[in-house]
Amino acid sequence: MITKEQKQQIIATFGSKPNDTGSAEVQIALLDSRIKDLTEHFKANKKDFHSRRGLIAMVNQRKSLLEYLKRSNLESYKKLIEKLGLRK
């Protein structure tokens, strides 16, 4: 679970303005943080299939947002991939 402070830090790091929560970069970074938290959860709870379905939905949402960002702003896409350490 992401705390309020962690969320604000992610928004400050990836957003263009202090309250920029809707840009693709911020949405991708927030999803990435939630995905990392859930993968840690699954190391201890291997049979939690209900949450695994939510994880798959988040991964697909992140994938579609990354594709959108790549189409619309390639330079921002490359910077974000490098900052988050994604394999692309």
From Swiss-Prot:
| HAMAP family in the record | Ribosomal_uS15_B (MF_01343_B)
This one is known as Small ribosomal subunit protein uS15
Annotated GO molecular function terms are: rRNA binding; structural constituent of ribosome
Signal peptide (residue range):
none
Q: Which SMART domains match?
A: Ribosomal_S15 (SM01387)
Q: Does the keyword section mention Cytoplasm?
A: no
Q: Which Gene3D superfamilies match?
A: 6.10.250.3130, S15/NS1, RNA-binding
Q: Which CDD domains match?
A: Ribosomal_S15p_S13e
List the InterPro entries hit by this protein, alphabetically: Ribosomal_uS15 (IPR000589), Ribosomal_uS15_bac-type (IPR005290), uS15_NS1_RNA-bd_sf (IPR009068)
GO-annotated biological processes: translation
Indicate yes or no for the key word ATP-binding.
no
Describe the subunit structure.
Part of the 30S ribosomal subunit. Forms a bridge to the 50S subunit in the 70S ribosome, contacting the 23S rRNA.
Q: List the disulfide bonds.
A: none
Q: Which UniProt keywords apply?
A: Ribonucleoprotein, Ribosomal protein, RNA-binding, rRNA-binding
Task: Give GO cellular component annotations, separated by semicolons.
Answer: cytosolic small ribosomal subunit
What the protein does comes down to: One of the primary rRNA binding proteins, it binds directly to 16S rRNA where it helps nucleate assembly of the platform of the 30S subunit by binding and bridging several RNA helices of the 16S rRNA. Forms an intersubunit bridge (bridge B4) with the 23S rRNA of the 50S subunit in the ribosome.
What organism, scientifically named, is this protein from?
A: Leptospira biflexa serovar Patoc (strain Patoc 1 / ATCC 23582 / Paris)
Highest taxon of source: Bacteria
* The family this protein is said to belong to: Belongs to the universal ribosomal protein uS15 family.
